[in-house]
Amino acid sequence: MDAAALWQRYQDWLYYHEQLGIYVDISRMSFDDAFVERLEPKFVKAFKEMDALEAGAIANPDENRMVGHYWLRDSNLAPTPELKKEIITTLEKIEAFAADVHAGRIKPATAPRFTDVISIGIGGSSLGPQFVSQALAVLHPALELHFIDNTDPAGIDYILDRVQDRLDTTLVVTISKSGGTPETRNGMLEAKNRFKNLGLDFPKHAVAVTGYGSKLAQIAEEEGWLAMLPMHDWVGGRTSELSAVGLVPASLQGIAIREMLAGAKAMDEATRVHDLKTNPAALLALSWYFAGEGAGKKDMVILPYKDSLMLFSRYLQQLVMESLGKEKDLDDKIVHQGIAVYGNKGSTDQHAYVQELREGIPNFFLTFIEVLKDRDGTRFEVEPGVTSGDYLSGFLLGTREALYEKRRDSITVTLPEVTSKQVGALIALYERAVGLYASLINVNAYHQPGVEAGKKAATDTIALQNKIVQILRNTLTPLPITSLADKAEAPDKIETVYKIVRHLAANKRGVELYGNPAEPGSLQVTLKG
């Protein structure tokens, strides 16, 4: 395509949101008009399904649940007055709690104000809050925000050690809808133990963000925690950033949460339009479908040219992959759908994997996230008339052109600046794009059976470990690995048995291994003490 035709294509397919100042450019996706025409009937269906979802239809049939994250930024959309009131009341509670903490009306026993917050959660209870925290971080936040997002003991120690000297002025926000998520429960118990060891009253520092009547809600009530803020059962983890899950840590940090909600609402209105070319989320879904032939055949590379948006790709990994990565479609047919997502930031990635993107296997499409405003501070020129930001913009434009020369497809999403409103809009844009794409490929975007299978396997492993320890405790002589597996009634899981005892031995849990580590089948196991 010559330069004049390419310029015309850019103008023909450019979307611009006047209120938000956001552009979506899909002109470098190499579809033609015939492809768009073929897909239009699918979009008619997708738009109708999205309307039904917003109206309160059961959009998650596997769990028989409504899907209501869009109501969070416009409570007038809620299908019942009770739900509308619940949304409004929850937001008011979040704002009041944060205001009381900032003003010192809610304070620690030994100081006039809290200084830090540890947010404990995993998956959607952490990825969104971390992305927003980094994207909108201010130099002097109302409270310093830290995250425990795994059950890694060393990682937990790292966070707790960092705030050790300020633990007496630290809030702990535990985020879990059920209260039974092992990683989150473990993080909470580890934090609770650290407070206890320092003679601090944990409940006077503890906040729960959880579902009504959950295990965590019961603990918070029984122990007298500072606050319990609700998670709604009609909001899934990966679409929960604009619920209490994301708004509580953001508000405590001092981020303008009403602006985030306003940005999301404005984008929701734009992505509700039943016209492909004037709906930015539909343009993204169209591009994803074209790139992967509706079967996820190409990976989605997310490349934000802004340090503050670096975690956006990690956030999108869950939103896209957990929503779309499904074995079966809504008709119960095996389809193995999904889109793999990865990325970091530009121009850093130009010195990492962009070499392969330009000259290697063309198994991807790329999304550039561009931010027009360089900085808030005084402009500095690294060369006469040239700033660091000019270089950043030049690297983005140059990489986009270099990829196009090699027929590598790309999308560009442009923000005027990184503000609370823009971040809220960006989240809403991709939430809607995922929902529309899910309709195009006929999958349930709002359940995660694969995650549940992994949780069950982990629970089974812990049960097997307890059984192994009990067997060793009742056995006076060392046991061969094979005999131990037989006694545990797990001969088909002998490798798991071996790895359990190896882990226990490495952590000095009383288990000792005898034999050649390079020949696991020769090892003998015993329990000392």
UniProtKB/Swiss-Prot annotation:
GO terms for cellular component: cytosol. Coiled coil: none annotated. This is Glucose-6-phosphate isomerase. Keywords: Cytoplasm, Gluconeogenesis, Glycolysis, Isomerase. NCBIfam families: PRK14096.1 (NF010696). The gene is pgi. One of its GO terms (biological process) is glycolytic process. It holds the Pfam family PGI. Belongs to the GPI family. Pathway: Carbohydrate biosynthesis; gluconeogenesis; Carbohydrate degradation; glycolysis; D-glyceraldehyde 3-phosphate and glycerone phosphate from D-glucose: step 2/4. InterPro entries: G6P_Isomerase, Phosphoglucose_isomerase_CS, SIS_dom_sf, SIS_PGI_1, SIS_PGI_2. The active site is at E322, H351, K455. It catalyses: alpha-D-glucose 6-phosphate = beta-D-fructose 6-phosphate. It is found in: Cytoplasm.
